[in-house]
């Protein structure tokens, strides 16, 4: 399993415009590095890539050994998700992780809250400021 191209294309350019806008500054999609250049920083944090370092327990940056993995844990779409992957390839392949993974992050709770307000027709600027705009502030994205 892997992330879809539609999912990747849904991320805005850092200036807040969609990639299909001719003035967006979209670099292109010949290589993964091009696709994630100048995009919403959260995309770079989600998609596993050769340049993404892992931070290990002692705080030392380690090379991303997992980005070069092959076999069952490598994405068939070419867009591998960082979530639930471990930098140690042997542990990842064995499916014997001893780490406590987060299932719901606070960011997801905020997004669920905003979506519920949108579905109920009660989404106001105040709701956006308490949910989505809080997340956008963390990565210096423009407010909605």
Language model: regions and residue ranges:
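Acidic/polar-rich alpha-helix caps and helix-coil junctions
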Residues: 1-144
């Amino acid at each position: 399993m892997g992330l879809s191209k539609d999912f990747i294309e849904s991320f805005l350019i850092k200036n807040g415009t969609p990639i299909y806008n001719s003035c967006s500054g979209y670099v292109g999609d010949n290589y993964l590095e091009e696709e994630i250049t100048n995009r919403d920083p959260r995309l770079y944090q989600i998609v596993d890539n050769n340049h993404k370092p892992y931070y290990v327990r002692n705080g030392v940056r380690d090379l991303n050994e997992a980005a070069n993995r092959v076999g069952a844990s490598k994405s068939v779409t070419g867009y591998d998700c960082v979530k639930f992957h471990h930098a140690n390839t042997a542990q990842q392949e064995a499916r014997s992780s001893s780490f406590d993974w987060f299932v719901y992050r606070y960011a997801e709770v905020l997004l669920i809250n905003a979506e519920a307000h949108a579905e109920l027709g009660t989404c106001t600027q105040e709701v956006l400021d308490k949910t989505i705009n809080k997340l956008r502030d963390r990565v210096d994205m423009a407010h909605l």
